[in-house]
């Protein structure tokens, strides 16, 4: 029983660490780069040097990636909840 709980905890801790790295990548690299790209294309469109479809594509990519980010955050919170439940059971 103790070995099973220990194994569960180790698995959850590894999954949480991995998910935290993924969330951090979104926060530090991916989302800022997509936001900057969208802003640059928006400025270009406002100055009549960019295409509307490029701007819309950047907007869609940014929004879809933000949704993926929030999914990763939800997954992280779910893992943390599972860990709390495992700790309470033992």
PLM features per residue range, with description:
Residues 1-68, 78-86:
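Amphipathic alpha-helical coiled-coil segments
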Residues 72:
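Metallo-beta-lactamase
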Residues 89:
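Small/polar (Gly/Ser/Thr/Ala-rich) solvent-exposed segments
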